[in-house]
A protein has these predicted regions:
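Glycine-rich, low-complexity intrinsically disordered segments
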Residues: 1-153
């Protein structure tokens, strides 16, 4: 016999903020999905016809954030830190990797979920597209690599 439970309330995806170490709160219009994949390692043992399966390497997909371009340079400056570090000039703070939280909120601003991305750093920055015939705002995006994510709340 089916049991009737409490109705579920699904989380809306339109309200979220991003908190980045040393950058503060940032408003973005879009955030790509978070995903993790565990490789499936198969091997055959002792002539068995059925493979043994076990978890392999874990990979976390990069996340892309998009927002309207403003005079704020924080994301570009962060990328510049990474560029200087990777060029071997040694002119930057070794702590270019930062933690960031993606905070999903309800309509009234109550935190529903908090995803923590650990040791993130920008791999790509796109300044946006310019068009004399367009009415839209310039949208900049940054793609971030990170070590792992976890659901905090």
């Amino acid at each position: 016999m089916a049991v009737i439970g409490n109705p579920r309330s699904f989380h809306k995806k339109f309200k979220f903020i991003v908190e980045i170490d040393d950058v503060g709160h940032a408003g973005f219009q879009k955030c790509s999905e978070l995903s993790v994949e565990v490789a499936n390692v198969q091997y055959f043992e002792g002539g068995s016809l059925i493979p043994n399966k076990s978890p392999g390497r874990v990979t976390f997909a990069d996340v892309t954030l998009e927002r309207g371009a403003t005079v704020d340079r924080d994301l570009f400056d962060w990328l510049q830190d990474v560029v200087v570090t990777s060029s071997g000039l040694g002119l930057t703070d070794p702590y270019y990797k930062r933690n960031l939280d993606i905070v999903q909120q309800d309509r009234d601003g109550t935190t529903l979920r908090r995803w923590c991305l650990s040791r993130a750093w920008p791999t790509k920055f796109v300044a946006g597209e310019w068009d004399n015939e367009a009415d839209e705002n310039v949208i900049e995006s940054v793609t971030l690599a990170y070590d792992f994510f976890e659901l905090i709340q």
